[in-house]
Amino acid sequence: MSDTTTTDESQDEPPADTPEAILRAHLDDHDYQIFEALNEDGRMSDTELSDRVGLSRTAVRRRRENLIESGILDILAVIVLQEADLAYADVRVSVDQSVGRAERDAIIERLVDAELIYSVNSCLGDHDLFVRTWHTTLNDVKAYVWDLLDDPAVDDYKITPVVKTWKAWNRDLDRPTSD
C-alpha cells in the first residue's frame, strides 16, 4: 500500500506557475501578502495592511519599507492609456551588429530618457530591444518613433500598434465580451 498522505508543508505550497510560487525566492508569505494588498490599493495604510496580513503596524511598515528600499517593490501611479483614449504601440528594434558598445548604449540611453517611452527591454530573438511608447494618435506615435530611431546604428524597427489591453501590471483592465 502506498503512502498518499501529504505533509502540511506541501499543502501550504502555492500552485506552480503562479506569481506566489515564483516570488517565493524573494518574498516570504507576509511580504507576498503585503505585495498583493498594495497591488490592489497602493494607498493602503499600514493599519489596514496590518489587519490584512496579521502583523503589527510596525512590522508591516518595516517590511514594506524594506521591500521598497531593496527595489523589489515599487508603488507608482500609471496612466491606463486605453482608458485615456491615447494611442500606444510596441516597437521592436534591431541594432546594427557592427556598431560598438558605446553606440548601442547611446541608443538605449536615448530611449530611456524619452518621456513618451514607458518601457525599454533587451530581448533575444529577431530584435535586440523591445520598446513601448504612447502618444496622442497612432500617426503621432509613428512620427515620434521615426524621429527617435533616426540613427545609423539602428538597423531596423517594427511598430506594432496596440488596439486593446485586457491585462497590465497584474490587473485585469477589461474582459473580452461576446457580442
Residue ranges and their predicted role:
Residues M1-D179:
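A compositional/biophysical signature of low hydrophobicity enriched in polar/charged and small residues
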